[in-house]
């Protein structure tokens, strides 16, 4: 089976970089973390999604206009770190509150 990976250790970083390069006016990355951020701040309750990265990085598709404000991704087959999620919460507009959505990932309970 062939793969489309440059380096398995960098797959989440490269995926986020490619997504941001495709939509530079809409998204940015939180430095030092696997966090995709919506650049369009809103006067609303912010939504932060936490989920594993790698094979099925579905949360990035939910970040955008009228949807989630950030997603925090873990490495391949791993949940995001608490520090990564906390920094995403701190970065998004949080005056009206933040709704956190987390998946039932095996890494969450280890």
Report the location of each language-model feature:
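N-terminal glycine-/lysine-enriched basic segments
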Residues: 94-110
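Glycine-rich oxoanion-binding loops at beta->alpha junctions
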Residues: 55, 61-95
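N-terminal amphipathic/basic leader segments beginning at the initiator methionine
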Residues: 1-47
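Fold-independent oxyanion-binding glycine-rich loops
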Residues: 23, 50-53, 70-71, 102-105
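Structural motif
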Residues: 44-48, 75, 96-100
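Glycine-rich, flexible N-terminal cofactor/catalytic loop recognition
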Residues: 34-65, 72
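Conserved active-site and cofactor/substrate-binding residues in soluble primary-metabolism enzymes
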Residues: 7-14, 42, 54, 58, ...
């Amino acid at each position: 089976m062939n793969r489309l990976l440059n380096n398995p250790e960098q797959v989440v970083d490269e995926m986020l970089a490619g997504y941001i390069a495709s939509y530079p006016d809409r998204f940015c990355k939180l430095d030092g973390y696997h966090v995709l951020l919506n650049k369009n701040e809103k006067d609303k309750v912010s939504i932060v999604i936490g989920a594993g990265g790698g094979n099925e990085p579905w949360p990035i598709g939910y970040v955008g206009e009228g949807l989630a404000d950030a997603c925090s991704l873990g490495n391949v087959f791993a949940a995001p770190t608490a520090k990564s999620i906390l920094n995403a919460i701190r970065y998004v507009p949080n005056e009206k509150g933040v709704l956190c959505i987390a998946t039932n990932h095996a890494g969450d309970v280890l």
